[in-house]
Amino acid sequence: PTYSLSFGDKTVIKPSKLGLELANDTDLTDGFELVATKELTFDDTWQPVWGETKDIRNHYNELLAELRQPSTGRLMNLRFRVYDDGVGFRYEFPVQPNLVYFVVAEEHTQFAMAGDHIAWWIAGDYDTQEYDYTESRLSEIRGKMAGAISDNASQTQFSPTGVQTSLQMKTDDGLYINIHEAALVDYSCMHLNLDDKNLVFESWLTPDAVGNKAYMQAPAKTPWRTVMVSDDARQMLASNLILNLNEP
């Protein structure tokens, strides 16, 4: 499966691949057929226990794509929620006889950038977030990585182009883009690894001691992968997209 994202007439995410690689099992990356789609519009207001505002509006259009992998008979759903200021999407696995307990070896969620954006980033590290932010073009991350890493008692970098979420970017034509996640429950946190030749980020999950990324039992779902976008930098701070996707 693939997806793409635009903001008005501007491309935010070029066609990007989705899928999960399973440990010692058939991967959930390709060979799917579309079984059904469901759409809905949701609009409600809720009140947080505390926060900057009394009322928060949760307004989105949703698309649920139900997929089936004929070679295995397995089912995987992709749920997208589109807001005025971005999108959230996740993988879902309904109850089914051919997929009950499974181990995620890798998540191959891609974010193909439409240009060599300016980015504000922290070096990807399994053990610490105690680094200063570095500002650079995406293509400069590799060259600036060594200087972005300061001494720390616990450090495990995973790639010379790996960065942490949330990742904030700005395009040359004035769009602000943020990649992050929401509803992180019983799953590994997501970093991003950059293919700096093609300017494609891919999810990079923190492994456990034996290298696995998640242990799941259907029915199950992954965290939301979020992309916020606006032509106003202030909207990045004002957005409630991630709050709305963090279900109680």
Kindly label every feature range from the protein language model.
Residues 1-247:
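N-terminal accessory beta-strand-rich subdomains and adjacent acidic, glycine-rich linkers
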